[in-house]
């Protein structure tokens, strides 16, 4: 629920400072069901150029429904082999991909089902999250492994999201660097 909290903080900051911050409409499904998911998408999506569905990565009926509806699935992973194991197994010596990990298998199954029902293809994008410059050696190994997994699991790799102190400090206000010029001194 981090995305929801960030957007809620953003609304509070805009109200407290009396500034107009661009803010998307958003909703949280407290009792997630397929019916409430479709109702919310129809209600909010009618006026939107695109819809972002933020779901926990645990395999559940609502997660499966969200992925089945997606045109693009974005999966953040920490730059660690523990996270990569969820996408696909790597041989400990050669680092060559083996079978899909539990998350990779779930995504593969859902992609196949969507194609079988002629509902289009899900583009899968994996992005390294919380990348710290101090971990250069580990990052090089993770990058190489991700490159091999991307071929085996058919996903695209996006540029990593750096861990920036400034971002962490702005989160409690629901802000980004792009908002700073809108905020009065």
Q: Model-flagged regions — what are they?
A:
Residues 15-18, 87-88, 137-140, 170-174:
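Short aromatic-enriched loop/helix-cap "lid" or pocket-rim segments at secondary-structure transitions
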Residues 21-23, 92-94, 176-178:
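Short, hinge-like loop/turn segments at secondary-structure boundaries
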């Amino acid at each position: 629920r981090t995305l929801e909290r960030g957007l809620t903080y953003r609304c509070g900051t805009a109200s407290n400072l009396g500034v107009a911050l661009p803010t998307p409409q958003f909703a949280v499904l407290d009792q997630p069901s397929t019916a409430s998911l479709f109702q919310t998408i129809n209600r909010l999506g009618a006026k939107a150029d695109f819809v972002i569905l933020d779901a926990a990565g645990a395999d559940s009926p609502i997660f499966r429904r969200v992925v089945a509806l997606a045109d693009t699935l974005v999966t953040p992973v920490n730059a660690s082999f523990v996270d990569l194991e969820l996408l696909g197994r790597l041989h400990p010596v050669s680092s060559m991909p083996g079978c899909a990990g539990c998350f990779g298998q779930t995504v593969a199954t859902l992609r196949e089902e969507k194609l079988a029902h002629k509902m289009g293809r899900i583009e899968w994008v994996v992005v390294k999250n919380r990348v710290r410059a101090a971990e250069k050696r580990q990052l090089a190994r993770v990058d190489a492994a991700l490159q091999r997994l991307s071929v085996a699991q058919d996903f695209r790799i996006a540029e990593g999201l750096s861990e920036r102190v400034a971002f962490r400090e702005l989160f409690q206000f629901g802000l980004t660097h792009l908002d700073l010029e809108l905020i009065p001194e």
